[in-house]
A protein has these predicted regions:
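...captures the hydrophobic TM-helix bundle architecture rather than a specific catalytic motif
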Residues: 1-231
């Protein structure tokens, strides 16, 4: 499980490497770098999953592993952390994402051969993989939102990969604009939830802690009473 940070950051490093060097690299070298990188993190994902599912359980339940550090603090109770969360679902998703991405990379080596944007394509694939991995191991809903947006950006770049073709550009713009509407309401929901619960963390929101939701209900009740009193005056 100590490999998780490598699993997450290696695709980002690959994206930066291929993006910065771009045409300085020969196409097949760029493709090989991207594919080998994915092969490494796919292998590490399988090792991570094996270690996680064979580890001792706590009261018969798989342990939730959380590694995080504080990033932004708004108050004593409300802050945003950056970190990694490992539970059965996220560990399995690491395996699924890296496996599918590796197969896409291998297939693309021959499918994209001779394309002028070969290096750029593999850079975008690495960014997409990084975004998906960050999405499934996020420790809080705001961090998940950041990676959700990165997934949208990656999709936009891949859909509009052939930017000289008007239809590709139009499809990319359409996908980007439509998803932004949904993302706006997603963000509003996050802000409303954090305002009433005073937390972004998944472990607190899903813990069943009655005090969190009691505070939210109490705040809603007070707001309603204040509104009624003000309107009566």
């Amino acid at each position: 499980m100590q490999y998780t940070i490598v699993i997450l950051l290696l695709p980002l490093f690959t994206f930066l490497l291929l993006g910065l060097l771009n045409s300085k690299l020969k196409p097949m070298i760029a493709g090989t770098i991207g594919t080998v990188s994915l092969a490494i993190i796919a292998t590490l994902s399988y090792i991570c999953a094996f270690e996680y599912f064979t580890a001792d359980r706590v009261n018969g339940v798989f342990e939730t592993v959380i590694m995080k550090t504080e990033w932004l603090r708004f108050s004593d109770t409300l802050h945003i952390d950056l970190g990694l969360l490992l539970d059965p679902i996220s560990v399995m998703m690491l395996v699924i994402i890296t496996t599918v991405s590796l197969m896409v990379h291998i297939y693309s080596l021959s499918y994209m051969k001779g394309d002028g944007g070969f290096q750029r394509y593999f850079a975008f694939l690495s960014l997409f993989t990084f975004s998906m991995l960050g999405l499934v191991v996020a420790t809080n809903i705001f961090q998940m939102y950041i990676f959700w947006e990165l997934v949208g950006v990656s999709s936009y770049l891949l859909i509009g990969f052939y930017y000289t073709k008007p239809e590709a550009v139009a499809a990319a713009k359409k996908a980007f604009i439509v998803t932004r509407f949904a993302d706006l309401f997603f963000l509003i929901g996050i802000l409303v939830l954090s305002f009433y619960t005073q937390t972004f963390d998944f472990d607190i929101l899903t813990s069943g802690d009655a005090s969190v939701f009691a505070n939210a209900s109490g705040a809603t009740f007070i707001d309603r009473k204040s509104t009624r009193l003000n309107s009566s005056h």
